[in-house]
Amino acid sequence: MMTLRDLINKLLGRETASANTARERLQLVLAHDRVDMSSLTTDLLDKMRKEILDVVAKYVEIDFEEVAVSLETEDRMTALVANLPIKRTLTGEIEFKKNEDTQKKK
């Protein structure tokens, strides 16, 4: 299973990808066997969704209108599935900001 870190590293890599490939790469599946579903309230799921989006949005521009987060259960496994369509990566802007901050310190 690909970790979130692996996914972000792939997305921020030098290779370019089509929108569909990026969409597939950003489909995060966080699964755990025997999850106590009663503890996953609507408020908790909303908070998780917001936190996931906040972290991913630091690295890529997300199409927030197309974001889909859901819980899927199959057999004895429950998965939190997040489909986060990417508009573009923000690596250039991040590097620019780092350079700008470095210049200010001099």
UniProtKB/Swiss-Prot annotation:
NCBIfam families according to UniProt: minE, PRK00296.1
Transmembrane annotation, as ranges: none
Keyword Cell cycle attached: yes
Keyword terms, alphabetized: Cell cycle, Cell division
Family from the record: Belongs to the MinE family.
Lineage top rank: taxon: Bacteria
GO biological process, one term: cell division
Lineage of the organism: Bacteria, Bacillati, Cyanobacteriota, Cyanophyceae, Synechococcales
Its biological purpose: Prevents the cell division inhibition by proteins MinC and MinD at internal division sites while permitting inhibition at polar sites. This ensures cell division at the proper site by restricting the formation of a division septum at the midpoint of the long axis of the cell.
Record organism: Prochlorococcus marinus subsp. pastoris (strain CCMP1986 / NIES-2087 / MED4)
Name assigned to this protein: Cell division topological specificity factor
Gene3D superfamilies from the UniProt entry: Cell division topological specificity factor MinE
Record HAMAP family: MinE
